[in-house]
């Protein structure tokens, strides 16, 4: 200790009892043991923030006894990139199996290159125990989301695919569910070249 200084410290305050964990991560790690996760990563590049999150998740999954595979591809058209990640080809039509049914896996995990996530978020989704689970995020304004729903089919034909982007408030007030529409359900105009 330096000459001439006196250290004064208060008695340490007793620690509060830790709150019970909201998620059972031990259960999630047991659930993933022996399973195969295919990471579907559409896009061309990622940030170091994404890379750190991704590598942390990969290490944690392998340490928990899971196998991982990576399917990554790029196209300037995002729907093509997603098809390519599944080993599909949009020119072969709608009735295709992921990777033509040749890849054995238990889970597909789609992560866009601009998403920041944690290992805990993966396990929270796994603990939902649903066939399909998803999350979404707000844009920079903190109110608008990337979630969009199509207008009625007639509006789609008239306006050429205008969507209503949802806000947190509009989602909370929504009375009807989002509608899933097969892409073969819509009739697209014929394009003629000259």
Q: What are the residue ranges of the model-derived segments?
A:
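Short beta-strand-to-loop acidic/aromatic patch adjacent to the donor-nucleotide binding site
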Residues: 96-116
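Short beta-strand-to-loop element that shapes/binds the nucleotide-sugar donor at the catalytic cleft/hinge
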Residues: 134-152
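N-proximal low-complexity "stem/linker" segments adjacent to membrane-targeting elements
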Residues: 3-72
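Short, flexible, basic/aromatic active-site loop/helix in glycosyltransferases
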Residues: 153-182
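Short, conserved alpha-helix that lines the donor NDP-sugar binding/gating region
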Residues: 78-101
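Conserved donor-nucleotide/metal-binding helix-loop-beta segment in metal-dependent transferases, i.e.
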Residues: 120-140
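Single conserved hydrophobic/aromatic residue that forms the stacking wall/gate
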Residues: 185-194
């Amino acid at each position: 200790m330096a000459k001439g200084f006196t250290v004064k410290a208060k008695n340490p305050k007793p620690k509060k009892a830790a709150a019970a964990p909201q998620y059972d991560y031990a259960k999630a790690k047991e659930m993933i043991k022996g399973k195969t996760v295919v990471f579907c990563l559409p896009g061309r590049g990622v940030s170091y923030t994404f890379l750190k999150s991704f590598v942390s998740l990969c290490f944690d999954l392998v340490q928990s006894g899971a196998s991982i595979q990576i399917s990554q591809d790029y196209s300037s058209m995002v729907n093509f990139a997603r098809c390519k990640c599944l080993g599909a080809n949009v020119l072969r039509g709608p009735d295709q199996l992921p990777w033509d049914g040749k890849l054995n896996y238990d889970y597909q995990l789609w992560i866009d290159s601009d998403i920041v996530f944690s290992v805990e978020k993966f396990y929270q989704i796994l603990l939902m125990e649903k066939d399909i689970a998803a999350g979404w995020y707000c844009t920079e304004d903190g109110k608008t989301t990337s979630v969009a729903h199509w207008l009625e089919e007639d509006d789609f034909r008239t306006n050429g695919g205008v969507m209503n982007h949802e806000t947190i408030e509009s989602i909370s007030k929504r009375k009807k569910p989002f509608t899933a529409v097969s892409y073969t359900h819509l009739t697209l105009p014929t394009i003629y070249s000259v």
